[in-house]
From Swiss-Prot:
It comes from Dictyostelium discoideum. Residues 107-110, 184-200, 266-285, 368-440 are cytoplasmic. It comes from the Eukaryota. Residues 1-27 form the signal peptide. This is Frizzled/smoothened-like sans CRD protein D. GO terms for cellular component: membrane. The gene is fscD. Its main location: membrane.
Length: 440
């Protein structure tokens, strides 16, 4: 009797086969409360409202997709979330150090130029990105509940935590890419010895931040922030909004960055060997960071473009998996999701974001300029610290004496990184890092 009943149920399900996300036929019915694992049954009284709240229904049934989605196995999801926790935490502390170093808390106002301000904005943007995406120290115990507040429900902007983290994540991403492009242009202007006034500097800084605010807050009106099927945090959901409010600006910034790098290399190549060595000595670290970040942005851009082009394939894979679930309703464990998106490639995509903070520490944290900023700061240059650590006082005094000697006896000029470069009577031999002219 049990075998006959099992056969009838399987026959009924096959005959009433449905499509996934509009790929299945509409108007199907299933036994009340029945959904093969890992699909989740949702007793919906207001289907449209449930969809807006983040439930992904399978065709016209009351079965919903699990959260996180079926695109990866649970182990693969845990792997990428654990990476976001470990790499993100390291990156977060590295960025905190860099932000404090270049902020008014430590760096004196007269040490600010368009380049140092650009670096500060860049690091702040990356910091917002790594602390609002994936898993962090302060929400380890939440597990998937942070982005899956209820079984089978993906978080939406109606969920306060999702909206707040999505806003900060989008703002951080846009800030990072815009100021990365600005820094790459600034490095070229530095080598070309181009100076701008304070008014011009403030103007383009304000414009960049206005663009960032528009690209961040405009999608809220269309309720576009939420947790997606391949994401590890809340962000823009619809493809057209992702392209219009992020990837199109990213593409433009990548073009600007590529052109700037080519022009920088061209300028370095044109000068004599002696000047070339000085240029490389002064600009090698910023240039390497710009090139590394360019390669990471390009990888993320290519990965996103590739996965977007295969959205149809992803739905076909999930459709095949769900067919298997309903055909083998009594033994769903034999069904497996075929690989639609490479798990290692997806892992590296999210790792790239966290790698930027670590790279920032390597190229801007362990430098003479960082040491000089801290030694000049109030925190290490006060009577209490000098009494507590006498050796630090002598080092600070040596720094001041050295700087004074450079300015008076060698006709040196300080750069925005607090490093001196000898002047020459030949204007072609004078290297000036980016500065802001005090004249308006």
């Amino acid at each position: 009797m049990f075998i006959i009943l099992k056969f009838l149920i399987s026959f009924f399900l096959i005959c009433n086969f449905f499509n996934y996300n509009d790929h299945f036929a509409s108007g199907q019915t299933l036994p009340p409360g029945f959904c093969p694992s890992p699909l989740i049954y949702r007793n919906s009284t207001n289907r449209q409202n449930d969809i807006e709240n983040g439930y992904l229904f399978i065709g016209q049934t009351n079965c919903t997709s699990p959260c996180p989605s079926l695109i990866f196995s649970e182990n693969e999801w845990h792997r990428v979330y654990n990476m976001s926790l470990i790499a993100g935490t390291i990156s977060m502390f590295a960025l905190i150090f860099l932000i404090i170093t270049y902020s008014p808390l430590v760096n004196k106002y007269n040490g600010y130029t368009r380049h140092t301000v650009g670096i500060l904005f860049l690091f702040c943007g990356i910091f917002l990105t790594v602390t609002t995406d994936g898993r962090q120290l302060w929400d380890i115990d939440l597990g998937f509940e942070k982005y899956c507040p209820e079984p089978g429900r993906f978080a939406r902007q109606s969920d306060t935590k999702c909206l707040v983290t999505a806003i900060f994540f989008q703002y951080g991403c846009v800030t990072s890419i815009l100021w990365w492009a600005a820094i790459s242009v600034d490095l070229w202007m530095t080598i070309r010895k181009v100076k701008i006034s304070k008014l011009q500097f403030i103007t383009y800084a304000v414009i960049l931040n206005i663009i960032t605010l528009i690209l961040t807050f405009a999608p809220i009106a269309s309720k576009q922030y939420g947790y997606g099927e391949a994401a590890i945090g809340c962000w823009l959901m619809d493809l057209k909004y992702q392209v219009g409010y992020f990837w199109a600006p990213v593409g433009f910034c990548l073009c600007v960055g590529c052109v700037s790098i080519v022009l920088i290399i061209r300028e370095i190549y044109k000068v004599s060997d002696a000047i070339k060595k000085k240029l490389l000595a002064k600009h090698l670290k910023p240039l390497m960071l710009i090139i590394l970040m360019l390669s990471e942005f390009i990888y993320m851009f290519i990965f996103y473009s590739y996965t977007t082009s295969r959205r149809g394939h992803y739905h076909d894979v999930v459709e095949k998996y769900i067919r298997c679930l309903f055909i083998n309703a009594s033994n769903p464990s034999i069904c497996e999701v075929d690989v639609s998106i490479s798990s290692p490639a997806h892992f590296f995509f999210h790792f790239c974001m966290r790698l930027m903070g670590i790279e920032g520490l390597i190229f801007f944290g362990f430098t003479r300029q960082t040491k000089r900023i801290w030694l000049r700061s109030f925190w290490l240059n006060n009577s209490f610290i000098k009494k507590l650590i006498p050796s630090l006082s002598s080092i600070s005094s040596d720094e001041k004496t050295s700087n004074s000697s450079h300015r008076t006896t060698r006709g040196c000029r300080e750069t925005e990184f607090g490093e001196s470069i000898e002047q020459s009577n030949d204007p072609e031999h004078f290297i000036e890092l980016s500065g802001v002219d005090s004249k308006n």
